[in-house]
């Protein structure tokens, strides 16, 4: 089985976001997940699919609104 299952915490660590953010993405349907008992698991292929859908076209981003922090 090449498509391994990740916990919400593992996905959060990978994306450098909070676990709550991952749960919000799952509940909104933006990130596909499977339910195992009372817990959610994210297939590695679904995480890749989500990340591919989030790619930003640099020509469409207004960088003047960003801070120089």
Where are these regions (language model features)?
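Major-groove DNA-recognition helix of helix-turn-helix-type DNA-binding domains
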Residues: 15-39
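Basic Lys/Arg-rich amphipathic helical interaction modules
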Residues: 1-24, 44-69
């Amino acid at each position: 089985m090449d498509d391994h299952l990740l916990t919400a915490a593992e996905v959060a660590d990978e994306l450098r976001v909070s676990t709550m953010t991952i749960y919000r993405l799952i509940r909104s349907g933006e990130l596909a997940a499977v339910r195992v008992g009372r817990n959610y698991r994210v297939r590695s292929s679904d995480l890749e699919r989500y990340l591919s859908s989030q790619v930003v076209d640099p020509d469409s981003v207004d960088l003047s609104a960003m801070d120089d922090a």
